[in-house]
């Protein structure tokens, strides 16, 4: 008696499916960290751009008033509120979607008339608390032109 012939069936074998899953897992293992790194760098650049914009505003204020102006997120005075204390876009929820909280104060051991220090702190409670920049930490910009950061990375400002 002859055995019936096996029919050709369409589909994937278990081995083929597992091989495809391994390839997808490898691609994700490489792509996700690179994507996260890109997001951190993009938000860092946004914070730097905001610091530069605010320093330009400070210089304009200095040329009119012969002093710089200290401000923070909790500034009550009208003059302090003219400066944007968050990085990113203006608008109703701009601060909540921002990565950095920005403040201005006198440079250490100097009067506010002589030097202003802008600080951009990542992931505070007033902005996106989930954002952290382990490489650069807090970004700083002085009216003397000095740029800095609190993190271990040497090249935070390019």
Question: Model-predicted segments: where are they?
Answer:
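N-terminal single-pass transmembrane signal-anchor helix
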Residues: 1-38
């Amino acid at each position: 008696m002859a055995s019936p012939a096996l029919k050709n069936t369409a589909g994937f074998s278990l081995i083929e499916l597992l091989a495809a899953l391994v390839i997808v897992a490898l691609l994700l293992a490489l792509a996700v960290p690179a994507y996260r790194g890109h997001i951190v760098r993009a938000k860092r650049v946004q914070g730097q751009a905001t610091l530069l914009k605010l320093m330009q505003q400070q210089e304009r204020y200095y040329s009119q008033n012969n002093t710089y102006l200290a401000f923070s997120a909790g500034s009550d005075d009208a003059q302090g509120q003219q400066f944007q204390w968050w990085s990113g876009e203006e608008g109703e929820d701009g601060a909540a979607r921002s990565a950095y909280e920005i403040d201005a104060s006198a440079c250490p051991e100097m009067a506010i008339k002589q030097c202003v220090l802008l600080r951009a702190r990542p992931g505070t409670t007033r902005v996106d608390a989930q954002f952290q920049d382990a490489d650069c930490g807090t970004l700083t910009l002085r009216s003397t032109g000095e740029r800095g950061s609190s993190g271990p990375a040497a090249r935070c400002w390019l």
